[in-house]
Curated annotation (Swiss-Prot):
Protein name: Pyruvate kinase
Organism: Aspergillus niger
Gene Ontology molecular function: any one: ATP binding
Feature type site, description Transition state stabilizer: 254
Binding annotation for K(+): 65, 67, 98-99
InterPro entries membership: Pyr_Knase (IPR001697), Pyrv/PenolPyrv_kinase-like_dom (IPR015813), Pyrv_kinase-like_dom_sf (IPR040442), Pyrv_Knase-like_insert_dom_sf (IPR011037), Pyrv_Knase_AS (IPR018209), Pyrv_Knase_brl (IPR015793), Pyrv_Knase_C (IPR015795), Pyrv_Knase_C_sf (IPR036918)
Matching PANTHER family: PYRUVATE KINASE
Amino acid sequence: MAASSSLDHLSNRMKLEWHSKLNTEMVPSKNFRRTSIIGTIGPKTNSVEKINSLRTAGLNVVRMNFSHGSYQYHQSVIDNAREAAKTQVGRPLAIALDTKGPEIRTGNTPDDKDIPIKQGHELNITTDEQYATASDDKNMYLDYKNITKVISPGKLIYVDDGILSFEVLEVVDDKTIRVRCLNNGNISSRKGVNLPGTDVDLPALSEKDIADLKFGVRNKVDMVFASFIRRGSDIRHIREVLGEEGKEIQIIAKIENQQGVNNFDEILEETDGVMVARGDLGIEIPAPKVFIAQKMMIAKCNIKGKPVICATQMLESMTYNPRPTRAEVSDVANAVLDGADCVMLSGETAKGNYPNEAVKMMSETCLLAEVAIPHFNVFDELRNLAPRPTDTVESIAMAAVSASLELNAGAIVVLTTSGKTARYLSKYRPVCPIVMVTRNPAASRYSHLYRGVWPFLFPEKKPDFNVKVWQEDVDRRLKWGINHALKLGIINKGDNIVCVQGWRGGMGHTNTVRVVPAEENLGLAE
């Protein structure tokens, strides 16, 4: 079987038949990865040169973790990322701000010393301020004032990612809970606390989060990864804080607790996208159930046509080792097969010894995992699940993807203002790349969230429109997009290109699909 020529034709088979035809000699027919890669920038990668090296390896989105670092440090990341983006004109690099989120922590022990505690030991957990700096094995302070109102006997309390666990015996009064320690460990200062199975009423944003979001608005970040989202109203609150100036910033809801899973449908209605944040989620719910939650959330995002990111510990061993474990590679591949639009690296690129190698490994794994996707079947299922009647833009996107599959097209080239049409095209998961051409700088960056989309920023200003000038401008942008795709090797000369455009300028008018050949001197307007 020819390695590259057979792939596109085989992908219309049923899933089991398609998988049975795979072999290790198969390679993608084009050097095109559909899944975007998000990388956290830390001290080891915070320079223009190192960010460019990560981009060469396959990075699409720069992430800043606001649980760590000063504003001065994060400003340097933004400045370095924007300087790095200038080296590839027209190829945008997105910037994401990951909030710390509201959290519960223990108090301080005397002199911040660890205090040993034995399994079976009973003590009080208290919100009394007198113990805020005097936590010990008799009274351990928590900074969540309402804990006595929401917790009940039999519930669990995890400290320091579950290293120390307690069972609630009794709610004594409005400040005190009697608990039993479930394992040997140490009571330490300022450790994070999880309350699995308990509906907490923490605010969506802390004061620090609000200040951080305003910093992001001032610096025109492209997306916010909002931590510990529990309900749809949390997203509305974040949107209010971002305000008019931050209206183009995409809000990605991080689902990290049982409440977020339980309220996922209402969150999905409000948010621009979702992150399956498996670290804290694996503490809040039993670890064997995390993969069920992951599959559910990714599937619902795919059906809704909203981007979804899979994150946490994906190639964690590469923080210190040059090669990942086989389980980690399978984890990345399975996230791609589940339908993730993006995968994310944290410590691997922020503090790891092998950041470039980690991005390259993730890129190669995604590229090969995409070979195993039966795209025709995925398209048919998504089309059948689409609500009826669909709006015009989604109908055109559906028709364009169908045409691209039937024609074995080299690419879909879409002209868009807001990126909405590109998002709908991405929803239906074409085999070929989606070459997005836009004049909107923000859309060109945040569209990295959409699987299969290669966004390009068109450099020419919008002309004063009449019908003739508008059509010439449309053809000029299409030709520009095709030529850039040819130069980058995304498509080949002679490929069929499905072009998607509007019938007039502005947002919301996409209604035209046409097919042209990929040629450098394409007979469109100059």
